[in-house]
Amino acid sequence: PVSRALAVDLASVAGPLTADPSAAAIFAPGGVPLTEGGRLQQSDLGGTLAQIRTVGVGDMYEGLLGHKLAEATAASGGPITVSDLRNARPALAPVLSRDAGHDHIAFLPLPADGGVAAAAAFGVLAHDPSAMQAAGAASEAVAARFRAQGGDAGTLLSQGGTAPGLPALPASTSFVVVDRKGGAVACSLTLNNLFGTGRVAPGTGILLAASPAVKPPPLLGAAIVWNENIHAFKAAIGGSGQNAAGLAVASVLAQAETSGGMSPVPDPGRANAVICAQYLPGEPQSCQFSTDPRGSGLASGGSQ
């Protein structure tokens, strides 16, 4: 069923999205955008995911699925080639780590500048939890500085001062998942625009992302808090909300390290979080599963 959040987004981009036949067939069958509670069918995407599941993810990068995707994007006016897919493999990178009392915080590493943006905002809030405006300014300033001149996280965070803010940034979203043993994932992702280019690669069900060369990339914000001494998890946060994504993450982090709760983050930021004040594994009853009601998201959890 179509969620309220998806229905609102579909209504806001109905014109551009229905201009693409493949996208219109999915999101606006009969020429009318799907509404809340409507039935969303994505058979082509289901086939693509089934192929990845049965053949392996390598098929996306170097196999038949990669060739199919390259041909489909060409038909939609996209520039993706098989060579692009082959060279675009995911990679591991050391996190940006900061101490918070007895805990450690892992922020996203550069070039995902939402990590330094969140770290800068948290640095302000750690000294004054009420200084939201100053934290937001610090968040945007450090990200703008990185985009203008590059540099490493330590240098960027130590420079301080003010800098011009960021232009209006595109949409992103986030999710967090935690198991009862404290294994955690915090993920922030984007199509560089709401519904990306608004085009679906024919036969694949895959929405094509907008090029970061055309639009400024969003701030991708996520963080995980753990205690190394007791080998335990404390919190996982995902932030979104265009320019306020970094502040959203930092605001929840500050609450996790003080009250252990989660109040709404400053607009237009949104956050999804799992906070276990007494850590995992060990005290599952201390965990809160929270999503911002303004984002029409979903949060659920149990101790079994």
Region locations from a protein language model:
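Proteins synthesized as precursors that undergo proteolytic processing into mature forms
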Residues: 1-24, 46, 114-150, 166-278
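Noncatalytic scaffold domains of N-terminal-nucleophile
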Residues: 1-56, 60-62, 67-104, 109, ...
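Cofactor-pocket helix-loop regions in the catalytic cores of large enzyme subunits
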Residues: 34-41, 48, 52, 161-178
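Amphipathic alpha-helical
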Residues: 61-87, 148-163, 181, 189, ...
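Residues in well-ordered beta-strands of folded domains
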Residues: 98-99, 106-108, 207-209, 225, ...
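Generic structural motif
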Residues: 105, 159, 241-242
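Secondary-structure transition/turn motif
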Residues: 110, 240, 290-293
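Low-complexity, Gly/Ser/Thr/Pro-rich intrinsically disordered linker/tail segments
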Residues: 279-304
